[in-house]
């Protein structure tokens, strides 16, 4: 336990000794802050505004600030009376000369220092300068203030400049940050744009805006697409015409098919000529001059077949090119019926040739 007592006693003694060694040089001169406007030590050392020591229970003095005693001797006598009952007031006398010099140098600035009970501005000159100073830059650059200048904004500016000052000093203007941010960047600062005449609405907010990209190529593209949609139908119509032409070509072979029976007759008659006697040749020559009833029948059949093929061709073309198209199935059926008739005619001709 004695060790602890020694430690405690030594620490307390060192703290007291450090307080006793405090001098005026360790304290900075007044720098515009209330913490450095005055200083009072245990030994009676003091500088700055010590007028509050003359008052009782914080009551202000009857004398004005300029008429207050500012000499170092009066302050020393006042402090000596106040701290007469102090234990260390008579023991510490270090640095009195330095304190006197500092009090002399700070006497002019102490005249402008306000009462310590009423805080914060230091002198009246700075207060007057701040009173005539302009508003903060954020408020002067606000578009709301610019917009109000044209509409009787002078009154509002006067009210803004007539902010109630604390203790005769212009305190820093601190508006509500939310209101300031809402007011800043108002739409009244935007240039007035004439409304468009082609259907675009005027933008009512910064977040909603309309962009005109000029004439668009979409109309030209759509017109080309519509044109391409009509072209295949025209091509199909031309294709139908080709089918009609093809129909005439497919139905034309009856004319070409009509020739082979004659060639066959000549081909058959050619090899049979040497075997036939001369009277047979004479009979053939007479038959050529006066055709036999069989040949007449064959010729009649040829003429009837040719007329039927012509009528079928014309009917097929009319059916193909008629506006009321009856469908591809009936057209195919009509085309398929005609070759059957042709083949039947060819068979009949062969039978006639055999009979001859």
Swiss-Prot record:
Top-level division of the source organism's lineage: Eukaryota
Residue ranges with Low complexity bias: 133-143, 287-315
Compositional bias segments (type: Basic residues): 78-87
Residues found modified as Phosphoserine: 18, 64, 105, 109, 118, 138, 140, 142, 174, 292, 295
Keywords from the named record: Cell shape, Cytoplasm, Cytoskeleton, Membrane, Methylation, Phosphoprotein
Domain CRIB as annotated: residue spans: 27-41
Compositional bias annotation for Basic and acidic residues: 123-132, 318-344
Residues with PTM N6-methyllysine: 5
Pfam families: BORG_CEP (PF14957), PBD (PF00786)
Tissue: Not detected in any of the adult tissues tested. May be expressed only in fetal or embryonic tissues.
InterPro entries found in the cross-reference section: Cdc42_effect-like, Cdc42_Effector_BORG/CEP, CRIB_dom
Keyword field contains Thylakoid: no
One GO-annotated biological process of the protein: positive regulation of pseudopodium assembly
Segments for region (Disordered): 51-102, 122-182, 257-356
Membrane topology: Peripheral membrane protein
Cellular localization per UniProt: Endomembrane system; Cytoplasm, Cytoskeleton
Acidic residues bias spans: 345-356
CC terms in the record's Gene Ontology section: actin cytoskeleton; adherens junction; cytoplasm; cytoskeleton; cytosol; endomembrane system; microtubule cytoskeleton; phagocytic vesicle
GO molecular function, one term: small GTPase binding
Subunit structure, interactors included: Interacts with CDC42 and RHOQ, in a GTP-dependent manner.
Family according to the record: Belongs to the BORG/CEP family.
Cited function: Probably involved in the organization of the actin cytoskeleton. May act downstream of CDC42 to induce actin filament assembly leading to cell shape changes. Induces pseudopodia formation, when overexpressed in fibroblasts.
Name of the protein in its database record: Cdc42 effector protein 4
Organism: Homo sapiens (Human)
